[in-house]
Amino acid sequence: NKFAEVFNNIIFDTNKYSEIEIKDKMIEIINSKIETYSNLALYYLIDKKLVKNQNEIKNLFDKVISNTKDFEHKNLVIFKKALYFSDKFNEIELLEILNPLINSESVWKSHALYLMAEYFYADNQNQKAKEFFNQIISLENSNIDLRLQAEKRLNRDLSE
């Protein structure tokens, strides 16, 4: 696979390329629609801070999400998008991103609920935080660690 080769050449020999070349090649990989390498290229760009424009990052996430076929893999990318923007977006924008997870039976649902609960808790919106923490606890298939964290937060910080 040509794109696998390009990706590996870049990450194992970054000194051969300028930042602009790396960015352009990674975006080319994202546009290739090859799931594994599109994801890796996006995370590389973000990790190395090669894309500064938040709107461009949002668009790159959207491309990767739309090209990801596997349900849970797509949901993971959606969650990572929300996580990335959690300190940049308001609650409406975050909920827009996370609604596909919150309204599904995805394994990432409890993670999405936890992110929103912590978002509201950090913003002193304790009633909303409680609602999201309680949803995690009442979920049948919620992540065990997140359920414990939600219970701790409710008992320690949000009890009346």
Model-assigned labels for residue ranges:
Residues 9-12, 44-45, 117:
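A ubiquitous short alpha-helical element
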Residues 19-71:
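Extracytoplasmic/periplasmic/luminal assembly and interaction segments
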Residues 15, 20, 24, 156-160:
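Low-complexity, Pro/Thr/Ser/Glu-rich flexible segments characteristic
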Residues 3, 16-20, 54-55, 91, ...:
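TPR-repeat structural position
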Residues 49, 64-160:
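Soluble extracytoplasmic domains of inner/organellar membrane proteins
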Residues 1-14:
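Alpha-helical transmembrane signal-anchor/signal-peptide segments
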